[in-house]
């Protein structure tokens, strides 16, 4: 699809029912540079997605032995290659490997498939049991009801469909059964973790629901016996509950989490929202991105006539509209707290009892790349207007500024390592920035930085989160975005051929 900018200027004023209102000058800024050299075989090679995938393959040879040290592929919170680490069946590995799977489907390069399969085969035994480490330990998932441990299950279905090896389906069926055991709050939402009772986090929608929807499609397609209706309805119920309880209608965006506890207490958090506060008060970009992608990927599997499908498509449109609105026009990226700009910081750090001023906000790479993937895929699938290709292109240009490629070396800058639910704006932006692969220890506690931190967000000297290079969420997000934005030569949005584009 080619966008003619003069024609676009003419039709935009007549668009009805969209919040994508674009001034002529803004259109020119967004659409003037198609940046087709990456997607259409231009001079600026190598492509970003392939470079990141090759970097992982070459840096971590993915040896079988759990004592492989720096050669292990375990990107769990970016602890390698600085220290030995076991392989984890965990989203921090599943996300970059799923991004690599997308690059495999885009390029047909078998080494990516072999790498992913080898990683999975060190964790799946002959009976389809999932092992925690790569040395055949019988220890199961660290807790099978933690949704973060379920995300790699999407790869199990992909590998089964590619190889027909029943081990992968057996392992997937075990995770499918585990989903039935996740505890629920009184309203019916899955607990994010047992340590966070009654809390549904947006993150969890991406971690488990696309897998369950894909598994339900296996039922529906008669590939395996089972109840597709229950699987699909479970998925849409979780998405709708998040929509019901975290949606901010003014901003068309979603808060990080909500709490269904009868006593209103947010348990397990270092800096929780106020007791009785049903939702968090912060619009964290990556949690919104997880929700956005979770819904988009679920739509791949959900039947066209499912009664909840239109509501899910509406969620995708709402978020897409907000992404246009809150995109940083200077960089093309999105901020860590998506709706806050540095010229309009919240008073008192976003909390009435805050003792320090609000800290600056900053662009976050992984969320930005996930948004690009979601926008581009939604355009391709027809969920949103083709005009959003402009937003996706600007976002992709911004993401590429955060990817440093020097020969075989790759650095993806500016990704937050992890983010618990917090009660204040400051708790989401009070970051320790380092340009290395390791997380490193938290700053030592001081009198003004207690352990655990105080109920309100801590003073500026107490960093609550880390921003690093080559964090796994960032590596995976960039490959996902590249799988949509870096097509084979001559292809445009909506004209992908030869590979499975789900």
How would you name each of these model-derived features?
Residues 2-15:
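Bacterial N-terminal signal peptides that target proteins for export
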Residues 14-23:
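Bacterial N-terminal signal peptides
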Residues 41-94, 106-147, 151-153, 159-162, ...:
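CBM-like carbohydrate-recognition segments
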Residues 55, 102, 122, 174-181, ...:
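Alpha-helical scaffold segments in carbohydrate-active enzymes
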Residues 215-233, 298-310, 378-386:
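Inter-helical turn/loop segments and adjacent helix faces that build the functional surface
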């Amino acid at each position: 699809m080619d966008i003619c900018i003069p024609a676009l200027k003419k039709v935009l004023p007549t668009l009805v029912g969209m919040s994508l209102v674009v001034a002529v000058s803004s259109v020119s800024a967004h659409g003037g540079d198609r940046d087709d050299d990456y997607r259409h075989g231009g001079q600026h090679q190598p492509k970003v997605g392939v470079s990141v995938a090759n970097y992982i393959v070459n840096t971590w040879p993915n040896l079988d032995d759990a004592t492989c040290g720096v050669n292990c592929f375990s990107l769990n919170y970016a602890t390698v290659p600085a220290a030995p680490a076991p392989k984890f069946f965990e989203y921090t590995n599943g996300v970059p490997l799923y991004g690599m799977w997308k690059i495999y489907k885009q390029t047909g390069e078998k080494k990516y498939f072999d790498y992913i399969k080898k990683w999975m085969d060190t964790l799946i035994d002959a009976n389809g049991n999932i092992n925690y480490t790569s040395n055949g330990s019988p220890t199961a998932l660290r807790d099978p009801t933690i949704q973060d441990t379920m995300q790699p299950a999407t790869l199990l279905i992909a590998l089964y469909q590619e190889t027909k090896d029943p081990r992968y389906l057996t392992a997937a069926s075990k995770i499918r059964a585990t989903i039935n055991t996740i505890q629920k709050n009184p309203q019916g939402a899955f607990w994010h973790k047992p340590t966070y009772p009654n809390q549904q986090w947006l993150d969890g929608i991406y971690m488990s629901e696309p897998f369950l929807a894909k598994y339900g499609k296996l039922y529906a397609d008669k590939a395996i016996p089972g109840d597709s209706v229950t699987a699909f309805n479970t998925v849409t119920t979780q998405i709708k509950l998040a929509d019901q309880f975290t949606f901010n209608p003014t901003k068309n965006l979603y808060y990080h989490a909500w709490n269904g506890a009868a006593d209103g207490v947010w348990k397990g958090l270092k800096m929780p929202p106020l007791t009785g506060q049903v939702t968090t008060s912060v619009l964290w970009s990556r949690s919104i991105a997880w929700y956005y992608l979770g819904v988009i990927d679920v739509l791949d599997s959900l039947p066209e006539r499912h009664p909840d499908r239109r509501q899910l498509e509406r969620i995708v449109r709402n978020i897409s509209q907000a992404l246009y609105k809150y995109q940083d026009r200077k960089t093309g990226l999105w901020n860590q707290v998506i709706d806050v700009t540095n010229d309009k910081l919240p008073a008192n750090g976003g909390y009435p009892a805050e003792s320090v001023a609000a800290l600056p906000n900053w662009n976050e790479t992984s969320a930005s790349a996930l948004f690009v993937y979601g926008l581009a895929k939604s355009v391709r699938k027809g969920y949103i207007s083709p005009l959003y290709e402009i937003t996706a292109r600007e976002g992709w240009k911004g993401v590429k500024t955060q990817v440093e490629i020097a020969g075989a070396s790759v650095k993806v800058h500016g990704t937050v390592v992890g983010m618990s639910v917090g009660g204040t704006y400051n708790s989401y932006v009070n970051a320790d920035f380092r340009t290395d692969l390791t997380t490193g220890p938290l700053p030592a506690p001081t009198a003004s930085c207690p352990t655990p931190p105080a109920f309100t967000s801590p003073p500026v000297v107490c960093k609550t989160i880390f921003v690093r290079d080559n964090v796994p969420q960032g590596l995976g997000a960039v490959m996902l975005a590249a799988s949509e934005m870096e097509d084979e030569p001559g292809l445009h949005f909506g004209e992908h051929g030869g590979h499975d584009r789900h």
